[in-house]
């Protein structure tokens, strides 16, 4: 049976700029907003867009990500005619090969894609925070009779050199692509979201592999090749909230923006929910000394200190006299008595001992997963 569109989420990146937060897990598995992991946004967008077949391409430290996704039931992707498949590097007749880039990861999974038999493939990054209707992008792709459609976002000119930049004509047909140009001619930045006609992309990847032509990356190789070959390549303009959380600072900023009830992500929109795999936790407990304001406190938290403009993830503890300001406390982390945390991200299961002070006024501070800062007590 022919399926109209298959989504492939690229989730194998190490995310080295997130430092301690990605030493033991892949970047898409990093927690966000108290209740979610970063990949939840791409998966939820697929579910809300009516895409029922999703492949998640993993490579670096995939265990936590695999456990989180499971069979896809949290996103309604476990039906008879739908499903989530975890796609990891495997041994083939030519030997073991790690994914060498974004498009090479797709080539290595040609057999899986052929088994789904899609007309179109949607390529997504698993490490961005945003909401997007992919069905609307697909309709634009069809209306333009495009071979490739690239989602673009208008960025400030001073930031444009960080992105792949698209130069378009009056009809939004892409006439030139520059990968991170020093002197950008446009402010239309690639979001790393692509819709391809599958057979055309397949033919190109197979031919490139046979001829040993380097075609491992969409931005560096595939898009320029399409343009040089005269294929119809169009830009799809996106104007909603989108955040690349590839650095500590940007991850912290996105979490702080998310706290607001009227945040740009529109997180309380019941028509476009963000789904996640949520474990059942007991209710929150606020002790006699608890003072919480302008914060998100998720299920299972224990609070007996002061929390201001911060996020407490599932099962976090803030003990008596502790003060939390402008910070993200991930699941199971313990903030000891009298500790003071300001502008920091505290990783899952971390322990901040009694009286410890962490001040990120000049630079956001990070404590890694299960890391102990100070001298832990028997109670911890």
From Swiss-Prot:
The keyword ATP-binding applies. It is an enzyme of class 2 (transferase). Its EC number is 2.7.7.27. HAMAP family: GlgC (MF_00624). InterPro entries: ADP-Glc_PPase, ADP_Glu_pyroP_CS, GlgC_bac, GlmU/GlgC-like_hexapep, NTP_transferase_dom, Nucleotide-diphossugar_trans, Trimer_LpxA-like_sf. It catalyses: alpha-D-glucose 1-phosphate + ATP + H(+) = ADP-alpha-D-glucose + diphosphate. Belongs to the bacterial/plant glucose-1-phosphate adenylyltransferase family. GO terms for molecular function: ATP binding; glucose-1-phosphate adenylyltransferase activity. Keywords: ATP-binding, Carbohydrate metabolism, Glycogen biosynthesis, Glycogen metabolism, Nucleotide-binding, Nucleotidyltransferase, Transferase. It comes from Streptococcus pneumoniae (strain 70585). Involved in the biosynthesis of ADP-glucose, a building block required for the elongation reactions to produce glycogen. Catalyzes the reaction between ATP and alpha-D-glucose 1-phosphate (G1P) to produce pyrophosphate and ADP-Glc. Homotetramer. Pfam families: Hexapep_GlmU (PF24894), NTP_transferase (PF00483). Disulfide bonds: none annotated. One of its GO terms (biological process) is glycogen biosynthetic process. Pathway: Glycan biosynthesis; glycogen biosynthesis. Signal peptide: none annotated. This is Glucose-1-phosphate adenylyltransferase.
């Amino acid at each position: 049976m022919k399926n109209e569109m298959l989504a492939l989420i690229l989730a194998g990146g190490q995310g080295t700029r997130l430092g301690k937060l990605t030493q033991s897990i892949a970047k898409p598995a990093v927690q966000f907003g108290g209740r979610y992991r970063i990949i939840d946004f791409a998966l939820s967008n697929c579910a809300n867009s009516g895409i029922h077949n999703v492949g998640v391409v993993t490579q670096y430290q995939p265990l936590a990500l695999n456990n989180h996704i499971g069979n896809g039931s949290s996103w309604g992707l476990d039906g008879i005619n739908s499903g989530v498949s975890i796609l990891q590097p495997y041994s083939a007749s030519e030997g073991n090969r790690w994914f060498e880039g974004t498009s090479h990861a797709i080539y290595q999974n040609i057999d899986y894609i052929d088994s789904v038999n899609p007309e179109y493939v949607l390529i997504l990054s698993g490490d961005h925070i945003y909401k997007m209707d992919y069905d609307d992008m697909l309709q634009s792709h069809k209306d333009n009779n495009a071979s490739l459609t690239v989602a673009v976002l208008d960025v400030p000119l001073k930031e444009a050199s960080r992105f792949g930049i698209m130069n378009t004509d009056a009809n939004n047909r892409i006439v030139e692509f520059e990968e991170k140009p020093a002197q950008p001619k446009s402010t239309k930045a690639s979001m790393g979201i692509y819709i391809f006609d599958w057979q055309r992309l397949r033919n190109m990847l197979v031919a490139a592999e046979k001829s040993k032509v380097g075609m491992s990356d969409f931005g560096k190789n595939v898009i320029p090749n399409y343009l040089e070959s005269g294929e119809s390549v169009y830009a799809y303009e996106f104007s909603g909230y989108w955040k690349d959380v590839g650095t500590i600072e940007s991850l912290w900023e996105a979490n702080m923006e998310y706290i607001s009830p009227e945040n740009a992500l529109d997180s309380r929109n019941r028509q476009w929910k963000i789904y996640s795999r949520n474990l059942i936790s007991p209710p929150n407990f606020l002790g006699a000394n608890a003072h919480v304001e302008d914060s998100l406190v998720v299920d299972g938290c224990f609070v007996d200190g002061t929390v201001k403009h911060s996020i407490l993830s599932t099962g976090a503890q803030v003990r008596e006299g502790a003060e939390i300001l402008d910070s993200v406390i991930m699941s199971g982390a313990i903030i000891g008595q009298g500790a003071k945390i300001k502008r920091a991200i505290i990783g899952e299961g971390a322990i901040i001992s009694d009286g410890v002070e962490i001040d990120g006024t000049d630079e956001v501070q990070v404590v890694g997963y299960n890391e102990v800062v100070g001298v832990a007590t028997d109670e911890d």
